[in-house]
């Protein structure tokens, strides 16, 4: 009987600790210290929500900055109203497999075909490979700059203006030394459309 009482007490203590105290305290801390991130970092302009600055979106139109490759075809996973149910997933292909090599070669050819005049330039790796999650919101500065001529031509803008927007939404290295500078794809595209004006 003593063991049963101790077991029930342990269940109650851990239920209160793990089911109430821990979730409430982490939620309160997140709302106090990281309010924007805890609420999804949603980009909202004039009451309209355009997406999260922490999640990648697929842009395929030539007038937009393209992000990293997404592994799921959004068109395949829509509800009855046409709303996407799934945007991406990780790739399970081994980097050493022939199938992966073929896939990357196809992506390289596609990128080259849309970015004329850059045949001799190496394509930044993040334009032809996907990330672990498949939802990276950022690309490297090199990947963004590689696309400037195409975007400027499609939108009838100056290369300098497109570069200016890319520079505006480029973030530095973490703590100034880790990683590399990155460009937020959604923010650049919203700025190109004249929606985001910071």
From Swiss-Prot:
Any one GO CC term of the record: plasma membrane
List GO molecular-function terms, semicolon-separated.
ATP binding; P-type potassium transmembrane transporter activity
Q: Which residues cross the membrane?
A: 8-28
Note the InterPro entries from the entry: KdpC (IPR003820)
Functional note:
Part of the high-affinity ATP-driven potassium transport (or Kdp) system, which catalyzes the hydrolysis of ATP coupled with the electrogenic transport of potassium into the cytoplasm. This subunit acts as a catalytic chaperone that increases the ATP-binding affinity of the ATP-hydrolyzing subunit KdpB by the formation of a transient KdpB/KdpC/ATP ternary complex.
Family, per the entry? Belongs to the KdpC family.
- What HAMAP family has UniProt attached to this entry? KdpC
Return the protein name: Potassium-transporting ATPase KdpC subunit
Gene it is expressed from: kdpC
């Amino acid at each position: 009987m003593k063991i049963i009482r101790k077991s029930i007490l342990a269940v109650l203590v851990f239920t209160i600790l793990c089911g109430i105290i821990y979730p409430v305290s982490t939620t309160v801390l997140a709302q106090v210290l990281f309010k924007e991130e805890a609420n999804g970092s949603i980009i909202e302009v004039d009451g309209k929500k355009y997406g999260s600055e922490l999640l990648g979106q697929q842009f395929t139109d030539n007038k937009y900055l393209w992000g990293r490759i997404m592994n799921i075809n959004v068109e395949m996973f829509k509800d009855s109203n046409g709303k996407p149910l799934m945007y991406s997933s990780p790739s399970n292909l081994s980097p050493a497999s022939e199938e992966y090599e073929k896939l990357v070669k196809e992506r390289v050819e596609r990128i080259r075909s849309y970015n004329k005049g850059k045949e001799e330039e190496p394509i930044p790796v993040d334009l032809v490979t996907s990330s672990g999650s498949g939802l990276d919101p950022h690309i490297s500065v090199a990947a963004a700059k590689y696309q400037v001529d195409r975007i400027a031509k499609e939108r009838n803008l100056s290369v300098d203006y497109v570069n200016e927007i890319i520079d505006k939404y480029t973030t530095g290295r973490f703590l100034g030394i880790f990683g590399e500078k990155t460009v937020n794809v959604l923010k650049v595209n919203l700025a190109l459309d004249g929606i985001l004006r910071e």
